[in-house]
């Protein structure tokens, strides 16, 4: 049992080192320039150890995005606890995104790389589509709850969820390309507040 635990710990440490090295290289040099050899060299692992953890460079790319999205999901789950109304939950989600936005650092560059590779790499493309559909469905469920509880008036929750996701992704893209142009995280909070107000049952 003890040997198995130690092996699992070493395996997890190796995975973490590979991901950390890949994240830095993807952000600084780009996906295409980064090679498996360069990741292994920076992580201090053999290629055999790399391929034991990941079948390809693309799978490392996907794992980095999924790890980052897992933190976003935790923020969203936390925002839905406490029995607040849906508009207040969305405000809390936006605040969580704002927080992540300011601490994510190089991850935003990786997100841009991820989008760019979606046209050329089938694995990356599949995961990008899954990500978009996942969050579109999530926002639709949130809006449907708002309608059920009486806090929102939405005729087409699918369309409204698409609008919310488009606003979020559009602001993320602008923030990546022009990081000093605005406080993009704070702007996202304001934009989502306006969208929620437009769907609110309360009269202005």
Predicted features along the sequence, with ranges:
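Basic, helix-initiating cap at the start of DNA-binding domains
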Residues: 1-29, 33-45, 58-59
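Short coil/turn segments at alpha/beta junctions that flank glycine-rich nucleotide-binding fingerprints
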Residues: 28-32, 83, 104, 149
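Hydrophobic/aromatic residues within well-ordered alpha-helical segments
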Residues: 14, 57, 64, 68-72, ...
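Hydrophobic/aromatic-rich alpha-helical bundle segments in the mid-to-C-terminal region
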Residues: 125-129, 133, 147-195, 199-204
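Hydrophobic alpha-helical connector segments
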Residues: 63, 77-106, 160-164, 188, ...
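Amphipathic alpha-helical segments used for helix-helix packing
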Residues: 89, 102-126
């Amino acid at each position: 049992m003890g040997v198995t635990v130690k092996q699992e710990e070493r395996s997890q440490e190796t995975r973490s080192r590979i991901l950390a090295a890949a994240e830095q290289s993807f952000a600084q040099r780009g996906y295409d320039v980064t090679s498996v050899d360069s990741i292994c060299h920076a992580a201090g692992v053999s290629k055999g150890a790399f391929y034991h953890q990941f079948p390809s460079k693309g799978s490392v790319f996907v794992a980095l995005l999924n790890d980052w999205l897992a933190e976003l999901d935790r923020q969203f789950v936390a925002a839905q606890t406490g029995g607040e109304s849906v508009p207040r939950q969305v405000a809390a989600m936006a605040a969580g995104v704002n927080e992540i936005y300011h601490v994510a650092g190089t991850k935003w560059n990786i997100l841009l790389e991820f989008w760019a590779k979606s046209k050329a790499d089938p694995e990356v493309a599949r995961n990008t589509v899954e990500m978009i559909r996942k969050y579109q469905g999530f926002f639709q469920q949130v809006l449907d709850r708002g309608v059920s509880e009486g806090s929102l008036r939405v005729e087409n929750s699918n369309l409204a969820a698409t609008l919310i996701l488009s606003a979020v992704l559009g602001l993320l893209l602008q923030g990546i390309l022009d990081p000093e142009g605005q406080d993009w995280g704070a702007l996202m909070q304001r934009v989502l507040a306006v969208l929620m107000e437009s769907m609110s049952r309360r009269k202005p």
